[in-house]
């Protein structure tokens, strides 16, 4: 790629959010490296980058894998402030993690001072159907409440992992286009007010 082409590569800041052990790191590494990491090693903070072609547009995904443990809540808020889009993850094998996702959603909304922000909801570990505690319908209903896309995924089997990340980039793009449109309308309204005053 030429340096001129690289200068126009749009970067998207994505934050992985969910309780400890839901598979945030496994999902991220599966997306970045097409590898499943079996052992659980609690993350404090890891950052990954991947260039993708999404809907014929190049995108650089800057993915921040955050700590799920409560003691890192203050650090997580800093990441939330800077994130453009969020992958909210729970494990279908743990209802507690589903409840935590709702608390994390509230935390993001408070930190960003926004009711709606680009996000996708992911029920991970769909390969463990025999251990399911969270019905698919509960995830679907929560996503409808949040007005976001919902995916049941498996980091282990690489099921719908790419769909979730690409879906989030589409949401970020849509949100940015809406902001630009509103700003343009506001600017035009201000310009017309200036003309009237003169």
Curated annotation (Swiss-Prot):
Magnesium is among the record's keywords: no
Annotated GTP binding sites: 18-25, 65-69, 124-127
PTM annotation (Cysteine methyl ester): residues: 195
Keywords, sorted A to Z: Cell membrane, GTP-binding, Hydrolase, Lipoprotein, Membrane, Methylation, Nucleotide-binding, Prenylation
Main location: membrane
Record GO biological process: signal transduction
Propeptide residue span(s): 196-198
E.C. designation(s): 3.6.5.2
Molecular-function GO terms, alphabetical: G protein activity; GTP binding
GO cellular component, one term: plasma membrane
Cross-referenced SUPFAM superfamilies: P-loop containing nucleoside triphosphate hydrolases (SSF52540)
Pfam families in the cross-refs: Ras
Protein name: Ras-like protein 2
Origin species: Mucor circinelloides f. lusitanicus (Mucor racemosus var. lusitanicus)
């Amino acid at each position: 790629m030429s340096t001129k082409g690289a200068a126009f590569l749009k970067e998207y800041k994505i934050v992985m959010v969910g309780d400890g052990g839901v598979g945030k790191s496994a999902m991220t590494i599966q997306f970045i490296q097409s590898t499943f990491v079996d052992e659980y090693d609690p993350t404090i903070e890891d950052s990954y980058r991947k260039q993708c072609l999404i809907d014929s547009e190049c995108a650089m995904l800057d993915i921040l894998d955050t700590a799920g443990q409560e003691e890192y809540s203050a650090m997580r808020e800093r990441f939330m402030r800077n994130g453009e889009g969020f992958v909210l993850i729970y494990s279908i094998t743990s209802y507690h993690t589903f409840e935590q996702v709702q608390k994390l959603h509230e935390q993001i909304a408070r930190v960003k001072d926004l009711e709606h922000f680009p996000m996708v909801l992911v029920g991970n570990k769909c390969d463990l159907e025999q251990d399911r505690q969270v019905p698919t319908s509960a995830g679907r209903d929560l996503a409808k409440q949040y007005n976001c896309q919902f995916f049941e995924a498996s980091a282990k089997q690489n099921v719908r992992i790419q769909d979730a990340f690409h879906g989030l980039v589409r949401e970020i793009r849509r949100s940015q286009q809406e902001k630009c449109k509103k700003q343009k309308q506001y600017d035009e309204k201000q310009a017309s007010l200036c003309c009237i005053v003169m």
